Structure formats: structure tokens, C-alpha cells
Amino acid sequence: MDNLIEIRWHGRGGQGAKTASLLLADAAFNTGKYIQGFPEYGPERMGAPIVAYNRISDNPITIHSNIYEPDYVVVVDDTLLECVDVTSGLKKTGAIVINSTKDNDYLKEALKGYEGSVYKIDARKISEEALGRYFPNTPMLAAIVKVSGIMSDEELLNDMVGSFKHKFAKKPEVIDGNMKALEMALKQVEKVK
């Protein structure tokens, strides 16, 4: 990867979009990349729309601003398709990854003519099966890695097991559940168009 890759995350407060963007930044850093991972804060509350960003490159990153023309967009909550222009500035050569069970025709229509690639994944089903609760950020992290090719599946899994062991040292069942969610998501993300 020679070029700068820019990712914009759309989620709702409490869904873990910010955490996922920071985990992606850490994982990319650990593969030798230069990184940025940051949220955009306002007066948001639990459930309010939020935005987070990533920049990942093989070279030092000298730009320090929000991302207006991302290569990839991650939509953690598909209800945002009805109230946020998630494709704003999204490059046609990039892709959007949506947590959704809605049919492909609905997604294409909701994206208002976006011409690039569209992927979806059922992060709810994966997280509830793997973790016993709805935490969409872990499956969405794996999905964007798979779609973007920022790092290999193996690099992601190796980094995340270490990260989860540190974060959940006294909760091994949470480590196992998160690893299962990552593995499932890497296999289940599907191309819509």
C-alpha cells in the first residue's frame, strides 16, 4: 500500500464506531503503517449520530483535518442511511460497508446513486452469536479490513488477540467472543454491487 487510505465511520453514540476506528489505527500501526484515528465530537449523546476517521499510509501523514473525500465509509447503523449523507465525498473507486440486513435494492436506493462498490454484513447477528450482546463495532472492524485490504486477515487477528488480552485480561470469555466475531465477519461480509 503506497497511497494514503482515508476511512470515515458513521455510527451512533454507544455503538463503538470511535473504538473501532482507534482499534484499526492501532492494528495498522503495528503492521508498520503511519496512522491517524480520531472522532469528531459535538454535543452527542447515546444514540446520536457520530463520525470517526482513519488515515493509514506507508508514508508519514502530514494532513491534520477531518476527512471529506474518503476512500471507504463504514456505516455501523443502517438507520443513518435515512438521515445522514453517508456517501458525501466518497470516491467512486472506494467502497462503503454497511451493517444491514436490508435487501440489496433498498441499500442501492438509499445510497442515492453512489456508483462505487457496496458491501453489507449482519454485525448484529454476528455479535449476538459470538458475544451474546449487540456490539457491532468488532464485526465492522473486520469487515472494513477485509474490504479495504489495509492488512491481511492474519495480521488483524494476531494484533486483535493481543489487544483484547490487554483490554479484557480478567474476562477471557470476552476475548474469545471478540475473536470469534472478527473471524465470522471476515468470512461473512458480502458484496452488494
Feature-to-residue mapping (PLM):
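Active-site cofactor/cluster-binding pocket
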Residues: M1-K193
